[in-house]
Amino acid sequence: MKKIKVYPVILSGGSGTRLWPWSRKNYPKQYLNIIGENTLSKTLSRISSIKGNFFLMQNPIVVTNEDQRFLALDNSITYIKNTKIILEPTGKNTAPSLYLASLYAKDMNKTDEDSVLIVLSADHWIKNESYFNKSIINSIKLALLDKVVIMGVLPVNPNTGYGYIEMAEKKREGRINYNKVLAFHEKPSIKKAKKYLEEGNYLWNAGIFSLKNEIWLNLFNKFEKSNAELINNSWKKKIFDNHFARPNKNDFDKVKPNSIDYAVIEKIQNCKYELAVLSLKCGWSDLGTWGAIKEINHLDKHNNYIKGEVVSIDNVNSHIMSLDKKMIGAMGLKDIVVISTNDAILVANNSKLDDLKILLKGIGKKNKSLLNDHRKVFRPWGWYDELDSGDKFKTKRIHVKPKSSLSLQSHMFRSEHWVVIKGKATIFLDNKKFILKENESTFIPKKSKHRLVNNENKMLEIIEVQTGNNLSESDIKRFDDVYGRKSK
């Protein structure tokens, strides 16, 4: 019997602002070590492990944005050796993202109309993976019967942070039990959420879907015709760049944002395709809030979640995390969240966390960079940590991965001093090439062409001291870059 091809689609473009200061725009929650490893890697390993006798799981398709491309690549390459990561030119919500992925899947599988998409978010936590995998296999079976399958989670509390699915009558296909969908409901008030919990026929909308690729293409073209035309044109003009697929920006910028639910799923009841909901009972969270992080972790006898360098005395129902090496001393707190990073601290009452975006607006007015980047900034070649800065100087600790290099570049307004702390550096400076070992240093004059290379099999660490009138990251002129980056 011919096996069906199944394409997992991982949507990984979110910013995770509700987990500030841990999650930032350029290093959002799907790349954080929340559950022992980052959730993108965990999602990829989980879906890649699913096997069945009637289908072939294909390489996952990751959809993200330009700013996160190297983060996505670094965390995908273990599981996806030959895939393309689709880079949206601009964020347009989840429906256009999925349509791009479906066009890619169609290109990979032009002769088979029965291929199935499994749509997943990159930032979900699953407790019982065996049960989850069985649910995914059941969803594939239902999708092959031309059903559009959505996963719901049985509520364990009156959560106001999720949309809800109202279930209709129970149905059965073979050994698979599912429900028809009666209605979708927006994130409710606490009063409504309690009502949903009491009535028992509501599920949290987990945002996990399974359906035939051809059905998604047809539905999107039916309900989002103008967007479909623009995305089709954008995809036709795409550029492949190593692991990345870049749709045309001019066409894609004209696309109107819309979610999968609003654009298509909530309109399916008027179509020939049955909308089926499977109940997930495997332990699930979208890790979208500090409350959600607390819920999945071990709590002490006073209902506190404590992590890192923390001394906690007489605290109740609080969440205290030291995410750097700072010691936090906390005493007599009740219903309080304290999150410490190396450049920002959040202190809030549990009841005010839904208003975090108001606080972030104020922080953005004072120091916008705190919303975008950590002090430790990741690059395709490694990372740097800004240790100190002041009038006309900046000090960085720079780590370069094995067999990696920075771009050949120059700076108009700054000079640099490099000291090797660990490893061996190969330096290109104008027409010279030389080696620096541990405890050796060099000076990089402004306007000189230079490049830092690690040809070794272990990490290279240097301390860089910048001096000059303009120490901005925009003061980089690139002459050659192995990662395809251009000067800002």
Locations of regions flagged by a protein language model:
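Short coil/turn connectors at secondary-structure junctions
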Residues: 4-6, 57-58, 81-82, 112-115, ...
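A short acidic, often aromatic-flanked loop/helix-cap motif at beta-alpha or helix-coil junctions
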Residues: 91-96, 157-159, 190-192, 284-285, ...
